[in-house]
Each structure stands twice: as C-alpha cells, then as structure tokens.
Amino acid sequence: EHRVSELCYAMKFSNPENSEEYFTVESLVEAMVLLAAHGPQLPKPERIPRFNDSVEARLNATNDALQPNAGGQIEYWSDAIEGEIRDDPGISLHNPDTDVFMNYTLAGAYDSNIALLLTVGDSRESTYSAMADVLRATSMRGRDLHTNLEFHYGLVNWFLGNNINARPTTK
C-alpha cells in the first residue's frame, strides 16, 4: 500500500549542480505529478528514511463473512487517538459550528473502504502495538453498519501474540 511506503520513506530531489538546493516529497501522488510535469529534467531522488516501520488497517464496510456491505450510515465515530494516522474522505469531520459528528451514508457501490488507519514506530512490534491501541480505542456506530474493525483487532493481536515477524510460507 502506498501510504505505508510514504510513511517509511520520503524522496529528496537535489539540484545536481548545488546539493544545498533540494526539496523533499512525502507523497507518491505528488511525485507522479512532478514526473509527469518535468519528466527527464527531474533529478533522480534520494530515498530518505522517515520511520522504521508502518502498518495499515483498511477499515471496510463488510459483513461477518468479510463481504462488502454497502449502504450503512455512520452516526458516530470516535476521535483519532495520539499516534493514529487516519485517512478518510472527510467522514470523521465534525460540524465546524457545533462540533457534532455529521452522519455519513456509505455509498459502497464500487468500494467498501471507509478509511485507512495507520501507525508508525521504531520496530514492527511497537508499530503493531500502536495499531492494537488504535483499534481498541476505535468505535464506530450507525444504522445497518457492519465493518471489519473487530477482524483487524483480532488479527493484529494474533500477530502480537505469535511471531510478529512471521514470514509467509507455502509449506
């Protein structure tokens, strides 16, 4: 997922004639726009480490079988906690005048994704521990609303209880 890559690395573009002149890009979308606009004139970037580790949980509108479940309405979503990076299309915004959560109807006709919940850390274990905290603190309620939040919470804690550095195998 590109958001995880963006949290782990930035790109530094330096003037080949003067290394004191540079700019840093943290968004892959921004880098693609720069490449489209400037093509071969753009110098090769240097990869700059940002955080040692990052993990993402894709919060989706799904039923218990993890199948898409469109059309629900979000009536409450807890605020992000410290260390949580939340990417959503404005769903978690409060009314600027009343500071009340604004109900949000999930279209879901083409994508069941509600938001990305991300954490960063110095190690894989600290990053997953932070994600466990985020998932434990996250509460979302509404009408005909089903999500994979509990699935993610169970999966992250299973990883923490077993080998967090497990490698895939076909054996």
Predicted regions and their residues:
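ATP-dependent carboxylate activation and anion-phosphoryl transfer catalytic cores
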Residues: E1-K171
